[in-house]
Curated annotation (Swiss-Prot):
Gene Ontology terms describing biological process: tRNA modification
Protein's name according to its UniProt entry: tRNA dimethylallyltransferase
Cofactors demanded by this protein: Mg(2+)
Organism taxonomic ancestry: Bacteria, Bacillati, Actinomycetota, Actinomycetes, Mycobacteriales
Residues annotated to bind substrate: 14-19
Binding site for ATP: 12-19
Source organism: Mycolicibacterium paratuberculosis (strain ATCC BAA-968 / K-10) (Mycobacterium paratuberculosis)
């Protein structure tokens, strides 16, 4: 496979500048042509723009983007659905002779795409039945049911994690096996390419995250959440749990005063920092990643370094 038809994944923690690097790289590819494929789970949702730092259309420099705004907030985002859709987008871009640039920080989504995971079956009717049961008895009782059926799965899933509890019970019912036995099977790398990782010093990134959080609230995150509540956000299994959105919903439920919103802002910042630690831990385990320092290099140098690594895949 020549470099001209290799995907170029750009991964890394939240707030490191992956989207801007992707745009810079795409512009440098010039005549080859490039299209960007989103790998941020929450940017899949229509209307979730400010809180996910989704690039506005007029900031995308005319470069086609895929896997943005493909779900309503009431729909459940799943790794399996994303994998199928994003892989199809990438193959279509490659078939047209252009370069797919995969950009995001959602760990499972990225790995399932790059490493061709195979997922256990799903059945909407079985899922719906367990979700109804969740609504009737609550996540605590449902988790207790999971513990009776599969103690190992219950030990691995937080008692407050309704989505994973429902999924585990669905898989157990469909397969008749423990949940762990039906875990996604990791296949060989789907494409022969390099993975570019973008990170920077923790102190610098913390400062960026603080500014990013403040900017989201100042640019209208509360109004965005309020509008999405009118479109069913509260009923969304995954969308309502997104960082920033969950905190604002809780603040509005508590009265929506200045103090509640101040706490929501602080909780969003703290939650984002925790998420960054998880991202770093996950991505650092993958020794295929070529890491670039976003704090030590100018944007042009970062783009040059990313393209140099991509063009010289061994």
């Amino acid at each position: 496979m020549t470099a001209a038809v290799r995907p170029l994944p750009i991964i890394g923690p939240t707030g490191t500048g992956k989207s801007q690097l992707a745009l810079d790289v795409a512009e440098r590819l010039g005549p080859l042509g490039a299209e960007i494929v989103n790998a941020d789970a929450m940017q899949l949702y229509r209307g979730m723009d400010i809180g996910t730092a989704k690039l506005p259309v007029d900031a995308r420099r005319g470069i086609p983007h895929h896997q943005l705004d493909v779900l309503d907030v009431t729909q459940t985002a799943t790794v399996a659905r994303y994998q199928r859709a994003a892989a199809a987008d990438i193959e279509a871009i490659l078939a047209a002779g252009a370069v797919p640039i995969i950009v995001g920080g959602s760990m499972l989504y990225i790995q399932s795409l790059l490493d061709d995971w195979s997922f256990p079956a799903t059945d909407p009717r079985v899922r719906a039945r367990w979700e109804r049961r969740l609504g009737e008895v609550g996540v605590g009782e449902l988790h207790a049911e999971l513990a009776r059926r599969d103690p190992a799965a219950a030990a691995a899933i937080l008692p407050t994690d309704a989505r994973r509890t429902v999924r585990a019970l669905e898989v157990i019912e469909l397969t008749g096996r423990p949940f762990a036995a039906s875990a996604p099977r990791i296949g060989a790398p789907r494409w022969d390419t390099v993975i570019i990782g973008l990170d920077c010093d923790t102190t610098l990134l913390d400062e960026r995250l603080a500014r990013r959080t403040d900017a989201m609230f100042e640019q209208g995150l509360v109004a965005e959440v309020t509008g999405l509540l009118g479109r069913g956000l509260r009923d969304g299994v995954t969308a309502a749990r997104a960082l920033g959105y969950a905190q604002v919903i809780a603040a509005l439920d508590a009265g929506g005063g200045d103090e509640q919103l101040r706490q929501a802002r602080e909780q969003t910042y703290a939650g984002t920092r925790r998420y960054v630690r998880r991202q770093r831990s996950w991505f650092r385990r993958d020794h295929r990643v070529r890491w670039l320092d976003a704090g030590a290099c100018s944007p042009p140098r970062l783009a040059d370094a990313a393209l140099e690594a991509w063009r010289h895949v061994s």
